[in-house]
Amino acid sequence: MILMKNLILILIFAAVGFNTMASNPVHVIITAGQSNTDGRTPNEDLPAYIKALATDTLAYAEGAYRYCQIAQNDGKGEFIPFWPRAKRSGKNNMWAFDAVTYYWLEQLLQEKFYVVKWAVGGTSIAPDYNASKGRFWSAAPEWLAQAKPTSDGGNSLLLSFIQEIDMCIDKTLSRLKDGYQIDAFLWHQGESDYAKSKDYYRNLKTMVAYVRMKKKKKTGKDYSR
């Protein structure tokens, strides 16, 4: 898979690591970013071991992973079996790096796990304060205070992401017999922040801290380490 230059892939672990004992809480991953998290490589270029899971052997637009369940950009908190599929208008049988990540996690865990994903192409963390349109991941307090989730007609992707996670917790994860644990935050994004690249680290750190804070408030668990 060929990725655009200057993209950043960050894996932020919120727990000690994966333990495959079935008696432990169910594993949950949260994933966010822009086009290269949503997926921009045709499914025809999927690795052969993923193509083997397809039910459509022409365009590889349909199929299902055995264990991975995903809620992706739906705002409803509903999980379905994962298959690489971009959330965009037009052709959406496209994949991103996480398709490979989830495949190998399946091989490791050999049990059901859940992914909450929100990804939109052409977006940035740093907001444009003068823009009437646009969608941003910013957690800057002064900007976030006046923002609304994109799922409600606003321009905050971060608030939409938080809403999606909370909905998934309320509708599914909190009802699991063995409980759940958010193990990791996958983030892949970068080039749309080029104009404010010097601020990128601080903006990303602030955004991650906001997600951790909201999850601690929601679950009572400390995700600060």
Task: Cite the ranges covered by each PLM segment.
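N-terminal secretory signal peptides that target proteins for export/translocation
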Residues: 1-4
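Sec-dependent N-terminal signal peptides
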Residues: 6-16
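Sec/Tat signal peptide C-region and signal peptidase I cleavage site
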Residues: 18-22
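Cell-envelope and extracellular/periplasmic
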Residues: 23-225
